[in-house]
């Protein structure tokens, strides 16, 4: 066993003595040591119940004849961090989580690991760590919350609250109506109830094969979550016996299948960023061109909030991820059926008995929302290395208009609220990428303000920053190269005509190459917004969004 490094031999007497101080007995040194990587944090609704989850996981691990050791990671609630400097810490927290999990697990030579994530950066951070460490690992997430209902019976979620701010600002609803939405938008523990980033990543974790079927859609408050916990411990034991590790599971084909699901369900654009980072940690050469190839052959089968009024509970009722995959399996050349998963079985075996229970929620291949995926990769003279749009969250497929430029999210939100943006405009928010932000903050407040003011179909938004999974409308993010790296978005001038063509996958400014070259000679890189602390270090080391915004390593050759 890997853990023999800290428990076998006379020279490990000091190690055993310390371990006995934690409650271990002599017989425990003959059993596998399992890291329980939890993320219990009281300020995050998606994590406030994970203390109890951790207790249940430890019980299940002990019952399976193994020795559990629980530890916690940090986390950031993106919704609470929205609209202030806290959002700059969100994406960088992913790297801290990955580093901290790697540190604890490798310092103590665990034999296996069960990860308990749930919300935005915590799930991908743990997945990145699992790729690095590469010991048998099972993920069991905290689960989504249910949608809320206002006093009038209207179904609401967190995106409703954000959009309610814009609606109140423009006089469309009263203060009392906004308070009603606020009081009911997030009714319980769990990750926010739409197809936002947290739920998107937990669904992808399931399809990659790192989590059990049901992980992405079973509600946090559903008793079936406890059954998942029990099965997770049993599955880990099988993985350890068969020496099946994360890198055996997360192959290029597995990532293809994860993106196939992502396209079919119209997941968050952040899935692109995080999955590219996970691929890098797994040592895979996976890029945005391959994502685009998947998008072109996968139909969009289900729309979930913010693209519709359906929520994760509806997806679960309709059959969950397995039902979506089973429907996709009817189309030749989309899925890779014979790859292994944490169940110890293949994807084919995992979805064999699945079927769609409600075709209003999950459409059939014969009746898709569109023939191509709900996420698309755009390129052009404004995004030579790519950009991402959640095409399933807008009916507008082509938009052209003059750009209104803001050099920060705060500046943009103020401008939108002051009426500086009108119908037909293309809002550009730049210098908010991984390096320029720093931290590539989400633009949920501006997109929600635009939608809340009734301009969602009439105003486009471009940024080198990110979008929340709760964002909708004509929103193009992850523009690479970013402005702070000298990308073409930095060369835009007020009033330039920008064209977004979703069908042709184009993002262009109607300016000649000669004019752009002239502007580049005149461009000067702005001073970094942050020069000290963790964010200062992050800004110096982070790569662009098209490579997952991972930290670049120094070349020691």
Swiss-Prot record:
[2Fe-2S] cluster binds at residues 119, 192. Its cofactor is [2Fe-2S] cluster; Mg(2+). Binds 1 [2Fe-2S] cluster per subunit. This cluster acts as a Lewis acid cofactor. The active site is at 468 (proton acceptor). It is an enzyme of class 4 (lyase). GO terms for cellular component: cytosol. Keywords: 2Fe-2S, Amino-acid biosynthesis, Branched-chain amino acid biosynthesis, Iron, Iron-sulfur, Lyase, Magnesium, Metal-binding. Pathway: Amino-acid biosynthesis; L-isoleucine biosynthesis; L-isoleucine from 2-oxobutanoate: step 3/4; Amino-acid biosynthesis; L-valine biosynthesis; L-valine from pyruvate: step 3/4. Its EC number is 4.2.1.9. It comes from the Bacteria. The keyword Lyase applies. The modification N6-carboxylysine is found at residue 121. It catalyses: (2R)-2,3-dihydroxy-3-methylbutanoate = 3-methyl-2-oxobutanoate + H2O; (2R,3R)-2,3-dihydroxy-3-methylpentanoate = (S)-3-methyl-2-oxopentanoate + H2O. Signal peptide: none annotated. Mg(2+) binds at residues 78, 120-121, 442. One of its GO terms (molecular function) is magnesium ion binding. GO terms for biological process: isoleucine biosynthetic process; L-valine biosynthetic process. Homodimer. Belongs to the IlvD/Edd family. Functions in the biosynthesis of branched-chain amino acids. Catalyzes the dehydration of (2R,3R)-2,3-dihydroxy-3-methylpentanoate (2,3-dihydroxy-3-methylvalerate) into 2-oxo-3-methylpentanoate (2-oxo-3-methylvalerate) and of (2R)-2,3-dihydroxy-3-methylbutanoate (2,3-dihydroxyisovalerate) into 2-oxo-3-methylbutanoate (2-oxoisovalerate), the penultimate precursor to L-isoleucine and L-valine, respectively. This is Dihydroxy-acid dehydratase. It comes from Bacillus cytotoxicus (strain DSM 22905 / CIP 110041 / 391-98 / NVH 391-98). The gene is ilvD.
């Amino acid at each position: 066993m890997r853990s023999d490094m800290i428990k076998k031999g006379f020279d490990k007497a000091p190690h055993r003595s310390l371990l006995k101080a934690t409650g271990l007995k002599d017989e425990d040194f003959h059993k596998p040591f399992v890291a329980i990587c939890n993320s219990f944090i009281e300020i995050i609704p998606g994590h406030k119940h994970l203390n109890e989850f951790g207790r249940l996981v430890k019980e299940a691990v002990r019952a399976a004849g193994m020795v559990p050791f629980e530890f916690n990671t940090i986390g950031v609630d993106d919704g609470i961090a929205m609209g202030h400097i806290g959002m700059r810490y969100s994406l960088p927290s992913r790297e801290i989580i990955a580093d901290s999990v790697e540190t604890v697990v490798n310092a103590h030579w665990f034999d296996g690991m069960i990860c308990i994530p749930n919300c935005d950066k915590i799930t991908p951070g743990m997945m990145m760590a699992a790729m690095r460490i590469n010991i048998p690992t099972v993920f069991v997430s905290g689960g989504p919350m249910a949608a809320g209902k206002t006093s009038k019976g209207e179904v609401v979620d967190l995106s409703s609250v954000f959009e309610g701010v814009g609606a109140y600002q423009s006089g469309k609803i009263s203060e009392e109506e906004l308070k009603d939405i606020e009081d009911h938008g997030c009714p319980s523990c769990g990750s926010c109830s739409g197809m936002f980033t947290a739920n998107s990543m937990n669904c992808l974790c399931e399809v990659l094969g790192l989590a059990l079927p049901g992980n992405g859609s079973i509600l946090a408050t559903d008793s079936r979550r406890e059954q998942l916990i029990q099965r997770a411990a049993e599955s880990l034991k099988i993985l350890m016996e068969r020496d099946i590790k994360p890198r055996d599971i997360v192959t290029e084909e597995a990532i293809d299948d994860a993106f196939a699901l992502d396209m079919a369900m119209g997941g968050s654009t952040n899935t692109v960023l995080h999955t590219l980072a996970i691929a890098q940690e797994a040592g895979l050469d996976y890029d945005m061109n391959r994502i685009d190839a998947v998008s072109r052959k996968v139909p969009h089968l289900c729309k979930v909030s913010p693209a519709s009024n359906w929520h994760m509970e509806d997806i679960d009722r309709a059959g969950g991820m397995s039902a979506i995959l089973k429907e996709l399996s009817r189309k030749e050349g989309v899925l890779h059926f014979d790859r292994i998963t944490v169940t110890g079985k293949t994807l084919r075996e995992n979805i064999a008995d699945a079927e769609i229970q409600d075709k209003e929620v999950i459409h059939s291949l014969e009746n898709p929302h569109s023939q191509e995926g709900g996420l698309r990769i755009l390129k052009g003279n404004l995004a030579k290395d790519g950009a991402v749009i959640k095409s399933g969250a807008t009916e507008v497929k082509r938009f052209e208009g003059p750009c209104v430029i803001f050099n920060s999210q705060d500046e943009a939100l103020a401008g939108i609220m002051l009426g500086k943006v009108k119908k037909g405009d293309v809002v550009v928010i730049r210098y908010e990428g991984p390096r320029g932000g720093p931290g590539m903050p989400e633009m949920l407040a501006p997109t929600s303000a635009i939608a809340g003011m009734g301009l969602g179909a009439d105003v486009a938004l471009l940024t080198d920053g990110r979008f929340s999974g709760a964002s909708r409308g004509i929103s193009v993010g992850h523009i690479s190269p970013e402005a702070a790296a000298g990308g073409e978005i930095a060369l835009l001038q007020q009033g330039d005509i920008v064209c977004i063509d979703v069908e042709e996958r184009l993002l262009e400014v109607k300016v000649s190459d000669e004019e752009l070259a002239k502007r580049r000679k005149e461009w000067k890189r702005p001073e970094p917004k942050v020069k000290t602390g963790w964010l200062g270090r992050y800004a110096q080391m982070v790569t662009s969004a098209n490579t997952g915004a991972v930290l670049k390593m120094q070349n020691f050759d």
